[in-house]
Amino acid sequence: MKKALLTLSALALCMAAGVASAKEYKELRFGVDPSYAPFESKAADGSLVGFDIDLGNAICAELKVKCKWVESDFDGMIPGLKANKFDGVISSMTVTPVREKAIDFSSELFSGPTSLVFKKGAGYSTPESLKGKSVGYEQGTIQEAYAKAVLDKAGVTTKAYANQDQVYVDLTSGRLDASVQDMLQAELGFLKSPAGAGYEVSAAIDDPLLPSKTAIGIKKGNTELKALLDKGIKALHDDGTYATIQKKHFGDLNLYSGK
């Protein structure tokens, strides 16, 4: 009997420890690179704005936790997650096999293709058409992997930048012939700005290195946070909040694939 009581006591202690170890989030820290309008950027007053920002704040509201945004260059997102600088990454991060080896992801936030951006009339459409030209990309993105694996081998001079704003500076100054980047960001952000008035995008690039699904990046093995974020994302769809935010930024365009 004494042995049985000890066993039960040990079980109770283990259960209590399990409850205590379950983290109760009162605040969620999201890493963001605010150089990617209309998904994430800064307003004139310095506040963060964009589709991702609104989604992140809405997820926090659904989960009844405080949102804290931590700015970082995109290349520092995964190292930042591993170093616990933030709990998740909401910054147009595409889900790729390579990234899935390093971190986990929530369910889908949205999907979007990749394209080239260049001066109107240049007509770039393939790696071959860019031979001898210079193309910029943001470090740490799926476009970097494509540039190194495909464009470099096609005789294209590629250059990495810490953020998308720096890419645009060199593109508009003539130091770059084109950029390779998220198509929606280009069409709905850069091309609608005064600086992008004389530019256009190519058709979407069809390549296995350029998947389209984006999600919230999470530290590897944090299944509890993944379940919490998935719950918040589902709630946004169920109560119509996602549709409202999407319409605010993109009108009738649907970015959600449901995959």
Language model: regions and residue ranges:
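Sec/Tat signal peptide C-region and signal peptidase I cleavage site
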Residues: 16-22
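Extracytoplasmic small-molecule ligand-binding "clamshell" domains
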Residues: 22-92, 239
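Periplasmic-binding protein-like
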Residues: 34, 110-118, 191-230, 252-259
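Ligand-binding cleft/hinge of the Venus flytrap
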Residues: 42, 56-65, 143-162, 190-197
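Extended ligand-binding regions for polar small-molecule ligands
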Residues: 53-62, 124, 128-129, 134, ...
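Short helices/loops that flank or line small-molecule/ion binding pockets
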Residues: 58-62, 70-71, 75-87, 102-104, ...
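A conserved helix-loop-strand patch within extracytoplasmic ligand-binding domains
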Residues: 65-68, 93-97, 106-156
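A ligand-binding cleft/hinge motif common to bilobed small-molecule-binding domains
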Residues: 76, 91-101, 146-150, 177-210
